[in-house]
Swiss-Prot record:
GO terms for molecular function: ferric iron binding; ferrous iron binding. One of its GO terms (biological process) is iron-sulfur cluster assembly. Keywords: Iron, Metal-binding. It holds the Pfam family Frataxin_Cyay. This is Iron-sulfur cluster assembly protein CyaY. The lineage of its organism: Bacteria, Pseudomonadati, Pseudomonadota, Gammaproteobacteria, Alteromonadales.
Length: 107
């Protein structure tokens, strides 16, 4: 994958989440700047999603732990646990919000 392709795909991933924040039943907010997306929860905790361009990865930090996702085929996969990004971000957001949160891939 070229650097250009990586940036397009990583930005699309974050944009997909941004587009869904207002429709989310949990009272979430977000801030986005320079390849970093912060999801802000009602208790002021955050999930931080950021691009790691040199590694062609997307890193996710929750209040519980951190994960590094890399593109395998057409899915972002955690390089330690093997979890798929959308499944992981739904579970992590639900856990952090204390209520059901569902994000959907745009693919």
């Amino acid at each position: 994958m070229t650097d250009h392709e990586y940036h397009q795909l990583a930005e699309a991933l974050m944009f997909t989440i941004e587009e869904q924040v207002d429709d989310c039943e949990a009272d979430l907010d977000y801030e986005s700047a320079q390849g970093i997306l912060e999801l802000i929860f009602p208790d002021n905790s955050k999930i931080v999603i950021n691009k790691q361009a040199p590694l062609h990865q997307v890193w996710v930090a929750t209040k519980f732990n951190g994960h590094h996702f890399e593109l395998r085929g057409d899915k972002w996969i955690d390089n330690r646990s093997g979890a798929e990004f959308w499944q992981f971000i739904n579970e992590a957001s639900t856990r952090q919000a204390g209520q059901d949160v569902k994000w959907q891939s745009s693919l």
